[in-house]
């Protein structure tokens, strides 16, 4: 049986010794399999490898068949989101971080020789992860790489003071809120910031978006799950604080002023993630987050 993916990219978290060591191990293993390997520029610079093919993330997305991301969930979020902007290249996550909710392959010999080997042969399962995009006041656009979220888009106070929001969904008034902010999350992000704020867990394959209030000053404010085909308009209404902050997957802060409008909707691109054939999302919920753990 031949490999389904012949040109393989490696992307690692920068300035982390254990990641660099794993990248070197992975490179040697892939070489043994006779595969063509390209390493992301900064990832290669962190290793002792010489005379290797290197490329930017954009070049990797356009030239490679698959990308292996080594690191934690944060690095996976950043790399897979940027790769998806340029092509539909599938990604595989190898965990060298803490939780490893998205980077589902273990960083050990067994995972390389069995799990990764099988995936590269084409014996895998696939998750298509939706993303969100935003614009401010209909015309102020952030650079492309800073306007797409895989986990969530959050609007929060820049200091610890409440502010007001007015939310419309598909052009219809939905609700007002005063509090510390609002999270608009993809199903993938429902186990991240949104979950910490009391939101529901959504399966990554679900075609939904969840709006989760952050410390709403109300006894009856609850998360709201809507179709990912909906368009969400959020107006910044009043302030105790001079400004609020919009962030994407915890990065790329954009300052918002009073009376500005933020429009959020589904992005055209999706992230394609490859797992082992027997991957079970609900196993990951139980094992990584202790979901529905029986206590007695």
UniProtKB/Swiss-Prot annotation:
UniProt-listed Enzyme Commission number(s): 2.7.1.23
UniProt similarity note: Belongs to the NAD kinase family.
Taxonomic lineage: Bacteria, Pseudomonadati, Pseudomonadota, Gammaproteobacteria, Thiotrichales
GO CC term, one of those recorded: cytoplasm
GO terms, molecular function: ATP binding; metal ion binding; NAD binding; NAD+ kinase activity
Main location as per UniProt: cytoplasm
Binding site for NAD(+): 73-74, 78, 151-152, 178, 180, 191-196
Organism per entry: Francisella tularensis subsp. tularensis (strain SCHU S4 / Schu 4)
Functional summary from the UniProt entry: Involved in the regulation of the intracellular balance of NAD and NADP, and is a key enzyme in the biosynthesis of NADP. Catalyzes specifically the phosphorylation on 2'-hydroxyl of the adenosine moiety of NAD to yield NADP.
Location in or out of the cell: Cytoplasm
Gene this chain is encoded by: nadK
PANTHER family assigned: NAD KINASE
Name by which UniProt lists this protein: NAD kinase
Top-level EC class: transferase
Catalyzed chemical reaction(s): NAD(+) + ATP = ADP + NADP(+) + H(+)
GO biological processes: NAD metabolic process; NADP biosynthetic process
Highest rank taxon of the organism: Bacteria
